[in-house]
């Protein structure tokens, strides 16, 4: 339930906010003109977005310059406001009649170096070292999940590719999510409910009475039942080929409604250690209808990580759930683990992760809409070699 907000019975909650332009508080300048403020907290490299609509019926609203920095705080009167970060103004609109000014700002300045194409190569390094180097040259502070930072990268090229796209490619290959928030380049494990530093994000409990609308759907997972990735050692002349299959370990308590109809229990086998094959194919899931990754990876480990990352992404999309909270929650962020109650059993029994948060605020109300996906934090894997 919404236990973060406690107030006297019968009292009325009033929305509150503070807006800073560079280092100047301009809240008083816009409070009588504010029509709406929408703040979208996105997962991944899709920048967070701030949209402000101001009434300009008298024509006295000054247009901010592109590149100006807005810092926004939102919440409720009588409670500490929550800082939602810094946003760079990159769009300004004026329309009428009636005359309205729309200011659109994003959490990362994509007119800057993050979006500039670069050439480069990385040799015998780690994922963490690459992220830190890219953060440094973009004047950002890097924060990389420990489980990802130590991943070895024998070689990778960045060819006519922006840092934003290159980091996204690295994240997709290694089961991560990358984003820029409040001056930090975050590289964390997707859907695990932990911060980039490895700390667990406190779980939020939401009851049906907290919201006024919700939507739940189970996706057709029959579209793909598995993922394959190939690897090839170009330095090893031995003509060995190996197939490796990845399957989820059977959990004692698993939500049957979200379980793939072709899922089968697997008996764990301990195979003797053998030299890694020069060439091979790795599969996550079942072989009935397979999504084949087109990239040929340099090592078996890289192929395994890429296939597992893609398979996890497909599995997280097994069900979707969204809810609009009648009472806005400024303290909720993406990647927050959520437990819900008061809905159908299939919804209540599942662990969820927030993938998108949209706050809508004006002078009379404040609501928060959440989009969630299935959380896979407890999933374990085992492999079978098929020589």
Named regions from a protein language model:
Residues 86, 128-131, 164-168, 226, ...:
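Extracytoplasmic/secreted envelope proteins and their assembly/folding machinery
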Residues 95-98, 126-143, 298-305:
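Glycine-rich, acidic and aromatic/proline-enriched surface loops and short helix-turn segments
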Residues 86-95, 120, 192-194, 351-363:
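Short, compositionally biased
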Residues 2-7, 100-109, 146-221:
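Short beta-strand-centered interaction patches in the first periplasmic/extracellular domains
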